[in-house]
């Protein structure tokens, strides 16, 4: 209900009335809290990740405490064959020095035949801005090599 009152017209953009999969996240900046959520319908080309932030000491039950990021913070990247990224959650590296976003996406457009059966899980390292807030980056192409997470056992 709080997200509905915050996003208003986002609920109706492009005939999709869905905001789902909220994930509460404490950034490095302990003065803030975040809620990442998936916006738009997963069957549309516009499925993406949105962000709400609030001061950590605010009344988090008051919709006025929350600020909505004006644009999606993570969205499709057709040139990387990433469509409909959403369902984000966050995990730390084994030693806690790095943070990764776990999400799902498709290699084909969401409105293509067979798209609804083609989601795959993805893992991508996030960075931090100068204020300690997360930067999710650009969705990487499936199968792109990445460095082992910090603290991973050597094999």
Region annotations inferred by a language model:
Residues 51-64, 127-134:
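Short loop/turn segments immediately following beta-strands, especially the blade-tip
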């Amino acid at each position: 209900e709080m997200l509905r009152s915050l996003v208003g017209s986002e609920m109706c953009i492009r005939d999709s009335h869905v905001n789902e999969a909220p994930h509460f996240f404490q950034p490095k900046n302990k003065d803030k809290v975040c809620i990442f959520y998936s916006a738009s319908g997963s069957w549309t080309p516009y499925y993406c990740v949105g962000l709400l932030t609030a001061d950590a000491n605010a009344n988090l039950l008051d919709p006025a405490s929350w600020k909505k990021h004006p644009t999606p913070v993570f969205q499709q990247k057709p040139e990387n064959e990433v469509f409909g990224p959403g369902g984000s959650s966050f995990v730390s590296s084994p030693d806690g020095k790095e943070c990764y976003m776990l999400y799902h996406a498709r290699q084909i457009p969401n409105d293509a035949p067979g798209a609804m059966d083609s989601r795959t899980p993805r893992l991508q390292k996030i960075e931090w801005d100068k204020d300690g807030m997360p930067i999710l980056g650009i969705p990487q192409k499936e199968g792109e090599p990445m460095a082992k997470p910090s603290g991973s056992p050597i094999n």
